Curated annotation (Swiss-Prot):
Extra facts: The reaction proceeds by a bi uni uni bi ping pong mechanism.
Record's protein name: Pantothenate synthetase
Function of the molecule: Catalyzes the condensation of pantoate with beta-alanine in an ATP-dependent reaction via a pantoyl-adenylate intermediate.
UniProt-listed Enzyme Commission number(s): 6.3.2.1
Organism placement in taxonomy: Bacteria, Bacillati, Actinomycetota, Rubrobacteria, Rubrobacterales
Enzyme type, top EC level: ligase
Length: 291
């Protein structure tokens, strides 16, 4: 199968999307930063099943990386990504350069003259506290992608759960008219959530990284057993991580599944367990619904 059509500029992707819309097609968008794995491809296949046309963006967005993070070394393989996407049902790949999205490129970003989309209080919690400015960058680039691609639907994985909730709220609050479609986390057989950053892990670190899923399972198991005390569930996660020397826990929290506010105890509203840790030098996040 030949690679999907490659688009470089916002104008190109907008013109193509409008042509498809004019033909009566439902347009689906899957935003990614590339280095694609089965988790991304599951989103593309879901979009292909539900939409007439599918656009996948491949853009390593500099504004969602903080100082000292891995923007420069984030894995990039556009040609490999295009081959995978063609097999998954992608019609077009939108892969702009930084200059295509941000005008003057990284120099312009440092000027302080650009307007950004703020993530509000939801974006200040958890990942927002650990990575200041991260969700401002995420909201800004996703808003730009929505404006360029003009999709009917956009597909996001639950693996980045806080990002999903922030984007859902942004789409509602800013009247984008884009349906945000959540998709389940895809995992390795041992439970590790698929992530492009897993490629950074050494074999020893890869084994240690399983502790994140085991921690989430420990909390879910306690909840299934009738434990309602959220702090006890958090301690169950902490204990699993403490037993693995290569894992440095950053947070393990039981939160309301919509507001992401920390809970004192489980109640009638859906709850989520969130976890973030460094395994060696690699930062990983994961989450799970609590019964």
């Amino acid at each position: 199968m030949s690679p999907a059509t490659l688009l470089r500029s916002p104008r190109e992707v907008r013109e193509l999307s409008r042509r498809w819309r004019g033909e009566g097609a439902v347009v689906g968008l899957v935003p990614t930063m590339g280095a694609l794995h089965e988790g991304h491809l599951s989103l593309v296949r879901r979009a292909w099943e539900e939409c007439g046309r599918v656009i996948v963006s491949v853009f390593v967005n500099p504004t969602q990386f903080g100082e000292g993070e891995d923007f420069e070394r984030y894995p990039r393989d556009l040609e490999g990504d295009r081959r995978l996407l063609a097999e998954a049902g992608c019609d077009a790949v939108f892969a702009p350069a930084v200059e295509d999205m941000y005008g003057g490129g990284t120099t312009d970003l440092a000027s302080g003259e650009r307007i950004f989309v703020e993530a509000g209080r939801l974006g200040e919690l958890w990942e927002g506290e650990e990575r200041p400015g991260h969700f401002r960058g995420v909201c800004t680039v996703v808003a730009m992608l929505f404006n360029a691609a003009e999709p009917h639907r956009a597909y996001f994985g639950e693996k980045d759960y806080q990002q999903l909730k922030v984007i859902q709220k942004m789409a509602r609050d800013l009247l984008f008219g884009v349906e945000i479609v959540p998709c389940p986390t895809v995992r390795e057989p041992d439970g590790l959530a698929l992530s492009s950053r897993n490629a950074y892990l050494s074999p020893q670190e890869r084994r240690a990284a399983r502790a994140l899923w085991r921690a989430l399972e420990a909390a879910a198991g306690e909840a299934r057993g009738g434990v309602r005390d959220a702090r006890r569930l958090e301690r169950a996660m902490e204990e699993v991580c403490r037993a693995e020397p290569l894992v440095r826990l950053q947070y393990a929290a039981v939160v309301d599944a919509e507001t992401l506010q920390r809970l004192g105890e489980l109640g009638d509203r859906p709850a989520r367990a969130l976890i973030a840790a460094r395994v060696g030098e690699t930062r990983l996040i994961d989450n799970a619904a609590l019964p």
